[in-house]
């Protein structure tokens, strides 16, 4: 097989003093931190769609990226070539996982029969490549938003035949994920929302997507899939109002349909930005609600109101993200998937390596800094002191339901309670965090 990235053999760890652009400065896969290797902590994955499918097009211009496999008039042969190049890239980068949508890996064809045949054909190839390389599938999913049939939604579509088509794709993608040993299955409602209530039955659409998710859970148990089901929140884009706005909204949806024990969340940094939240907030919320599953690692631009899907480059932001994950015990089946794309001016094929190497080093350094914060209890001691009153008899009685509004009102009057404000010490804590990050 001809090498596409023939200038390099394998990306390796060379340390902080290295000036080699094709080397890791901080990511040492075998370095042990808090009892696990970096590789075990981060569980890195490359996404198929942005990395191997996007041609650099945007709303204002045609594709700018030269991708030889996209020029093949035989679309299935092009998909085979794409699989070869994808696994060459994955192997040389040295990441353990990848992720895909069904139509990322295989052409959809002109009928449902062609869709199924093409998809199964490429899954056969991916299965062989996984055996050959040891690279595994972090998660699979179905693209139920690109085809025009989904312009009014998939599970939320006013036409039940479109609902059935989406079910067909998810059925096949879940089965393929199971076959390939995928550790999760993701559901992103790309067009599960609406543009205007003038033509929308909101209650009905919520019931439709609720039933769809119940069917997904039923199928998971029917086929014996041991992985985790994940919903990926996003507030808007492509629709104006998305039903899976943020982590808290998703949790309310799961509770409504009795799915809170069955489905967790896959959190994307850029989606948190669009929702008006910090990345750290979304992860902390998911951990507090016990629905934290996996991460789509990228970044957005606070000045832009759309999904820019840039590679993560902030150690400051990701140290706090990593801190929340470590506090929660780390990933189980999830990991860091780079749902990020190079800029459309980055037309050199090796820009893909620069982007991933830099992002991986950012996560590795963030992991080291977060581990130090956790070990030294940089923040936790102060947080524990701040809430110490809730460990008192009064605090425990309130939490255990042994008090009422009336008994508390009587207590305050009897003891003439006059609690004094205590400093939140935000500036001091920010200084402590910076000391760790820049040490």
Swiss-Prot record:
Reaction(s) the record says it catalyses: alpha-D-xylose = alpha-D-xylulofuranose
Lineage top rank: taxon: Bacteria
GO molecular function: magnesium ion binding; xylose isomerase activity
PROSITE patterns referenced in this protein's UniProt entry, alphabetically: XYLOSE_ISOMERASE
Cofactor annotation: Mg(2+)
Keyword Cell membrane belongs to the record: no
InterPro entries found in the cross-reference section: Xyl_isomerase-like_sf, Xylose_isom_bac, Xylose_isomerase
One biological process term in Gene Ontology: D-xylose metabolic process
Protein residues bound to Mg(2+) 1: 232, 268, 296, 339
Active-site positions on this chain: 101, 104
Sequence positions that bind Mg(2+) 2: 268, 271, 307, 309
Signal peptide span: none
Localisation: Cytoplasm
Main location: cytoplasm
GO cellular component: cytoplasm
Keyword annotations of the record: Carbohydrate metabolism, Cytoplasm, Isomerase, Magnesium, Metal-binding, Xylose metabolism
Disulfide bonds: none
Cofactor note (record): Binds 2 magnesium ions per subunit.
Family per similarity comment: Belongs to the xylose isomerase family.
HAMAP family cross-referenced by the UniProt entry: Xylose_isom_A (MF_00455)
UniProt name for this protein: Xylose isomerase
Origin species: Haemophilus influenzae (strain PittGG)
């Amino acid at each position: 097989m001809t090498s596409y990235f023939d200038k390099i053999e394998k990306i390796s760890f060379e340390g902080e003093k290295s000036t080699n652009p094709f080397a890791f400065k901080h990511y040492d896969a075998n370095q042990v931190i808090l009892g696990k290797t970096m590789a075990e902590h981060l569980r890195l994955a490359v996404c198929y769609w942005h990395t191997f499918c996007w041609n650099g097009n945007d709303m204002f211009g045609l594709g700018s990226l030269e991708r030889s496999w996209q020029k093949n008039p035989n679309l299935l042969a092009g998909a085979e070539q794409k699989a070869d190049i994808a696994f060459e890239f994955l192997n040389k980068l040295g990441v353990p996982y990848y992720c895909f949508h069904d139509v990322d890996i295989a052409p959809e064809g002109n009928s449902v029969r062609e869709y199924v045949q093409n998809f199964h054909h490429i899954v056969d190839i991916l299965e062989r490549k996984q055996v050959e390389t040891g690279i595994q599938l972090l998660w699979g999913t179905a693209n139920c938003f690109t085809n025009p049939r989904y312009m009014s939604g998939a599970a939320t579509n006013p036409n039940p035949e479109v609902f059935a088509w989406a079910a067909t794709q998810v059925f096949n993608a879940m089965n393929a994920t199971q076959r390939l040993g995928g550790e999760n299955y993701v559901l992103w409602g790309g067009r599960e929302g609406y543009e205007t209530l003038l033509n929308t039955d909101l209650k009905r659409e919520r019931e439709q997507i609720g039933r769809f998710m119940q069917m997904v859970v039923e199928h998971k148990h029917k086929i014996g899939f041991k992985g985790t089901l994940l919903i990926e929140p996003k507030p808007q884009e492509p629709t104006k109002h998305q039903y899976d706005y943020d982590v808290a909204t998703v949790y309310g949806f799961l509770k409504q349909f009795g799915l809170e024990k069955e489905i967790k969340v896959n959190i994307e940094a850029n989606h948190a930005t669009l929702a008006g939240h910090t990345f750290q907030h979304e992860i902390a919320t998911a951990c507090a609600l016990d629905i934290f599953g996996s991460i789509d690692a990228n970044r957005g631009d606070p000045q832009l109101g759309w999904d820019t899907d840039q590679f993560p480059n902030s150690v400051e932001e990701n140290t706090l993200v990593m801190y929340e994950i470590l506090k929660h015990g780390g990933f189980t089946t999830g990991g860091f998937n780079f749902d990020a794309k190079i800029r459309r001016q980055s037309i050199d094929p090796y820009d893909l390596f620069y982007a991933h190497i830099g992002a991986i080093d950012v996560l590795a350094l963030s992991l080291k800094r977060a581990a130090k914060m956790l070990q030294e209890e940089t923040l936790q001691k102060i947080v524990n002191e701040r809430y110490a009153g809730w460990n008192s008899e009064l605090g425990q009685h309130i939490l255990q339901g042994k008090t009422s509004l009336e008994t508390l009102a009587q207590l305050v009057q009897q003891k003439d309670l006059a609690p004094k404000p205590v400093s939140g010490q935000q500036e001091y804590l920010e200084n402590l965090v910076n000391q760790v990050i820049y040490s």
